[in-house]
């Protein structure tokens, strides 16, 4: 195996500065060395506890500090979550992600969270959670329940971070990633484009991720979804080519990681999404309401997959069950996303 590159902001900036077509060619070349370029990993994300978050993340409609019209909801019952997971599997998802608007989970919540993980795993799906800061014991308990992935985004560069969030330090985020990794859970961590950051900040974010002791297995790259009532509601739109560049640089810097198109995909036309796949994106959230922002409808995703000749990735599970992939490919069912919260409605 080749020696791992220790990335600097300068090196990452050099990639961002490349002519776009050269950058895309390099990213696609790297992508093909590590992945089947036609395969796309498909996940569904459910908000299991919505709103009333004490954090002050300026982009987030779930913060209790902003008036966005979002109605807070308590932690969902375990069976409600499992029913949503069944629908997600039937409609093609191979990974089920559960998100809660907390600074950190409380002890009283842990037994329910463990039951959710165990129940989804029993269906033969991969599991992911995003619950805020974890301590070592909580990470171990989730690992023992069978949690495959834990999402905890760094959001932006260390230098720009304080302009966006003041209630949780950058180091706290890094510490949580370390505890998750130490418990044997795979790491999902990325950031957001469009917060008002510079290209150097985007480079700095990717450097932080790529230089972790083990890079994240999954790197979600979000485009800011501007929600009325949040401090960033009037931010300038992200140039699609700038977003595509970020995807490409992420692919080159973290060649073995899944690079996921996450929030903001509903704002992208088919051509932008196609160029993101060309740049090395190989994971999406499909057929869901992405926490408190909308996501494209399932049939649009399927149509785009067909146009581009892409296939949803088969995931080998403990039951060897790839029935969900077949259902997605054949579009046998129409999704029912009533359980997935959408603050845009």
Curated annotation (Swiss-Prot):
Textual note on the cofactor: Binds 1 [4Fe-4S] cluster. The cluster is coordinated with 3 cysteines and an exchangeable S-adenosyl-L-methionine. Binds 1 [2Fe-2S] cluster. The cluster is coordinated with 3 cysteines and 1 arginine.
| Gene Ontology BP, a term | biotin biosynthetic process
Q: Name the cofactor(s) required for activity, per the record.
A: [4Fe-4S] cluster; [2Fe-2S] cluster
**Domain named Radical SAM core: which ranges?**
38-256
**Pathway participation:** Cofactor biosynthesis; biotin biosynthesis; biotin from 7,8-diaminononanoate: step 2/2
Which residues are involved in binding [4Fe-4S] cluster? 53, 57, 60
Residue stretches spanning the membrane: none
**EC?**
2.8.1.6
What family is reported? Belongs to the radical SAM superfamily. Biotin synthase family.
- Note the PANTHER family from the entry: BIOTIN SYNTHASE, BIOTIN SYNTHASE, MITOCHONDRIAL
Identification of the protein by name: Biotin synthase
């Amino acid at each position: 195996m080749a020696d791992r590159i220790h990335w600097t902001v300068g090196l990452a900036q050099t990639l961002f500065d490349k002519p776009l077509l050269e950058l895309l060619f390099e990213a696609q070349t790297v992508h093909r060395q590590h992945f089947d370029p036609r395969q796309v990993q498909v996940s569904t994300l459910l908000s299991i506890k919505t709103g009333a978050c004490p954090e002050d993340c300026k982009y987030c409609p779930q913060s209790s500090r902003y008036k966005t019209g979002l109605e807070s909801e308590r932690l969902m019952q375990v069976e409600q979550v499992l029913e949503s997971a069944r629908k997600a599997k039937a409609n093609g998802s191979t990974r089920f992600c559960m998100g809660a608007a907390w600074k950190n989970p409380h002890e009283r919540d842990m037994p329910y969270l463990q039951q959710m993980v165990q129940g989804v795993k029993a269906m033969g799906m991969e599991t992911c959670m995003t619950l805020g800061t974890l301590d070592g014991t909580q990470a171990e308990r989730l690992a023992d329940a069978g949690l495959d992935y834990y999402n905890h985004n760094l959001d932006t560069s260390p230098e720009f971070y304080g302009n966006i969030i003041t209630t949780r330090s950058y180091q706290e985020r890094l510490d949580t990633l370390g505890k998750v990794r130490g418990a044997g859970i795979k790491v999902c961590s990325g950031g957001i484009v469009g917060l008002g950051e510079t290209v150097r900040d985007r480079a700095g974010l990717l450097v932080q991720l790529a230089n972790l002791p083990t890079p994240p297995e999954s790197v979600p790259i979000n485009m800011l979804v501007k929600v009325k009532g949040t401090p960033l509601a009037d931010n300038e739109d992200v140039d699609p080519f700038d977003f595509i560049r970020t995807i490409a640089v992420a692919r080159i810097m973290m060649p073995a990681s899944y690079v996921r198109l996450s929030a903001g995909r509903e704002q992208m036309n088919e051509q932008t999404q196609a160029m993101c796949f060309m740049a090395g994106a190989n994971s999406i959230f499909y057929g869901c309401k992405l926490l408190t922002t909308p996501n494209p409808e399932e049939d649009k995703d399927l149509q785009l997959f067909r146009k581009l000749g892409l296939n949803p990735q088969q995931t080998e599970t403990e039951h060897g069950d790839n029935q969900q992939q077949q259902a997605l490919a054949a579009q046998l069912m129409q999704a029912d996303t009533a359980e997935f919260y959408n603050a845009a409605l």
